[in-house]
């Protein structure tokens, strides 16, 4: 399946640069690709919860949203959580922050934007790189053209700056 192919290529790029990452994964993808999930963890990367089904939380009841996150975490087993679309209601944030560390980002590649060229995607990232920055890339079909171009060049720039890619730690 597509997600499997993209993650495998991302893992190969990260390995080439001896880089570690935190993958915020969907529970439904962990169910669909358990071997790939295990490969991510076995390679020394960290995983975080990105809900089970990538629902838009602001359109769901608090109870249903929490159920979706907790159902995903039965598969993912992580204390890290990132809401889809970076949108979460105050009530959802309060409830989830009691059990999870909510993690956003410093640099969004916007690799998912079909109107964005691969070069512009790279520029979005490299102009904001700094030590400790959390940079977001995606592993979807929609983002693959830009990610495939920008991620290895970003990893190369990080290396040239004397920085290192690490997982998010609590």
Predicted stretch roles:
Residues 12-22, 45-46, 52, 62-90, ...:
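CE4/NodB-like, metal-dependent polysaccharide N-deacetylase domain
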Residues 26-28, 52, 83-86, 107-110, ...:
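Active-site beta-loop-alpha junctions enriched in small/polar residues
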Residues 31-51, 57:
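Short, surface-exposed acidic-centric catalytic microdomains
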Residues 16-18, 29-32, 145-170:
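C-terminal domain-boundary segment and adjacent tail
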Residues 10-11, 33-38, 91-96:
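Distinct, well-ordered alpha-helical segments
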Residues 1-6:
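Short, small-residue-biased leader/transition segments that mark boundaries at the very start
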Residues 51-60, 111-113:
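A short acidic, helix-capping loop that chelates divalent metal ions and anchors anionic groups
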Residues 87-128, 162-170:
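His/Asp/Glu-enriched short active-site or ligand-binding loop at hydrolase and phosphoryl-transfer sites
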């Amino acid at each position: 399946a597509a997600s499997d192919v993209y993650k495998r290529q991302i893992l190969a790029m990260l390995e080439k640069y001896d880089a570690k990452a935190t993958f915020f994964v969907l529970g439904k993808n962990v169910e669909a690709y358990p071997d790939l999930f295990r490969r991510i963890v076995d390679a020394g990367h960290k995983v975080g919860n990105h809900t089970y089904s990538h629902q838009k939380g602001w359109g769901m009841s608090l109870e249903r949203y929490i159920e979706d996150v907790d159902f995903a975490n039965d598969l993912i087993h992580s204390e890290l959580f990132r809401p889809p679309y970076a949108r979460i209601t105050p009530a959802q944030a309060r409830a989830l922050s009691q059990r999870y560390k909510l993690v956003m980002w410093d640099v969004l590649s916007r690799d998912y934007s079909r109107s964005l060229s691969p070069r512009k995607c790279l520029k979005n990232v490299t102009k904001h790189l700094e030590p400790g920055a959390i940079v977001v890339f995606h592993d979807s079909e929609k983002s693959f053209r830009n990610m495939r171009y920008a991620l290895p060049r970003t990893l190369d720039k990080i290396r040239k700056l004397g920085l290192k890619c690490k997982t998010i730690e609590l």
